[in-house]
């Protein structure tokens, strides 16, 4: 287990506060491990094991507690004889019907500190806004960053170079459990395929009552094949029609929304750089873990430019940036990244091997006249910065948390 200190730094200030700590993210990205890390810190601070009460609602042992009243009554009964603050941990809380009512009641009745995890973005919508508005703080957990991957991979293969680690990261992605499989090719592929199936069936099909699973599969395949490219539900509808299937554009949009709610894909809006407004159409999608894409659909090395974009995009989210795609007339900037009063522009490419590529990637910035930092990221080893535009190796960018 690695410490995932970047997340602990964010969570630590809220430990022992009366705000409910909500950890969200794709299934198997490490949310349960984060709960374990929090428990470890509490025990080191002198909290007794009896004060820590945990429930994992994927465990059939807790099936009888999957409604709000039963869970509430169980916890009240279990804590009656305890003194001092109680620490409550609920893993995959979305399995509990009306869980918001239970959590809010416990927050009021008990001297407690509450942590919950969930694998669906809808966790923070609907009735939650009524019961816990202003009383929770959310932390989105992602699969391993490249820096975390290096830390973990070197416990398995000590002294592996950063470049060799990156080759492994490109192939396997960042799902934490792969380390337990020693990054064995066949075992990892099987595991990632199973994670994908679990997300599809539990977090998309079942949660959204989707009946046409075959159509969902086609949409998932289409999005995965076209990550980092302009998405249009109308175009997808026409594509499906050419395949002998028919689906209304609105239904396609609902299916895609179900996929983003399950954190399988992330939607990125386009921003008009001149008008400084987000555009309502022609967004892009990136996959939560590029290793899942390779295991299920294949083709990552064939689409290396898009996979590198995907890796950089997820890293920007980890660092707390709000990310959009920049549109300037007919030109497009890969990422506009904003955080508080900080703003940077990023172009991502595989290699700056040809003069045409260099002119294209650096030339995008010619018409942007503000003074915010502008980056071109590639796998080239030599610094090719020019005209105030910073060139950086992608590996160096991923391991430089100061950006």
Residue ranges with predicted function:
Residues 23:
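Hydrophobic anchor at the beta1->P-loop junction of P-loop NTPases
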Residues 31:
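Conserved lysine of the Walker
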Residues 34, 38:
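Hydrophobic positions on the alpha1 helix immediately C-terminal to the Walker A/P-loop
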Residues 54-84:
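Short glycine-rich substrate-engagement loop in P-loop NTPases that contacts/grips substrate
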Residues 119-121, 126-230:
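Interdomain motor-coupling "hinge/lid" segment immediately C-terminal to the ATP-binding subdomain
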Residues 326, 350-395:
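Catalytic cores of nucleic-acid endonucleases
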């Amino acid at each position: 287990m690695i410490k995932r200190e970047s997340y602990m730094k964010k969570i630590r200030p809220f430990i022992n506060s009366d705000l409910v700590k909500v950890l969200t993210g794709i299934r198997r990205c490490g949310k349960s491990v984060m709960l374990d890390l929090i428990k470890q810190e509490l025990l080191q601070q002198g909290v007794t094991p009896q004060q820590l009460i945990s429930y994992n609602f994927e465990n059939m042992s807790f099936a009888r507690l999957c409604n709000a009243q039963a869970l509430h009554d169980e916890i009240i009964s279990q804590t009656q004889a305890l003194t001092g603050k109680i620490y409550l941990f609920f893993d995959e809380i979305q399995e509990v019907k009306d869980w918001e009512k239970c959590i809010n009641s416990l927050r009021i009745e008990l001297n407690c500190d509450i942590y919950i995890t969930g694998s669906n973005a809808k966790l923070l919508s609907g009735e939650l806004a009524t019961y816990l508005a202003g009383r929770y703080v959310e932390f989105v957990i992602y699969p391993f960053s490249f820096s975390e991957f290096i830390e973990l991979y070197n416990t398995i293969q000590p002294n592996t170079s950063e470049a060799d680690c990156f080759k492994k990261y490109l192939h396997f992605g960042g799902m934490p459990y792969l380390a337990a499989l020693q990054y064995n090719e066949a075992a990892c592929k099987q595991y990632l395929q199973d994670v994908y199936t679990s997300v599809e069936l539990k977090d998309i099909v079942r949660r959204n009552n989707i009946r046409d699973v075959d159509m969902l599969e086609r949409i998932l395949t289409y999005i995965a094949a076209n990550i980092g490219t302009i998405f249009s539900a109308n175009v997808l509808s026409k594509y499906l029609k050419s395949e002998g299937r028919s689906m209304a554009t609105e239904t396609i949009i609902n299916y895609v929304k179900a996929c983003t709610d399950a954190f399988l894909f992330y939607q990125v809006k386009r921003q008009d750089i001149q008008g400084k407004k987000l555009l309502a159409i022609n967004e892009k999608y990136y996959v939560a873990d590029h290793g899942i894409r390779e295991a299920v659909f294949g083709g990552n090395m064939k689409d290396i430019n898009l996979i590198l974009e995907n890796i950089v995009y997820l890293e920007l989210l980890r660092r707390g940036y709000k990310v959009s795609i920049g549109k300037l007339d007919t030109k497009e900037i890969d990422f506009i990244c904003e955080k508080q009063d900080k703003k940077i522009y990023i172009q991502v490419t595989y290699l700056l091997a040809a003069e045409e590529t260099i002119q294209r990637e650096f030339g995008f910035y010619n018409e942007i006249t503000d003074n915010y930092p502008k980056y071109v990221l590639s796998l080239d080893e030599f610094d090719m910065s020019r005209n105030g535009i910073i060139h950086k190796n992608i590996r160096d960018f991923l391991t430089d948390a100061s950006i």
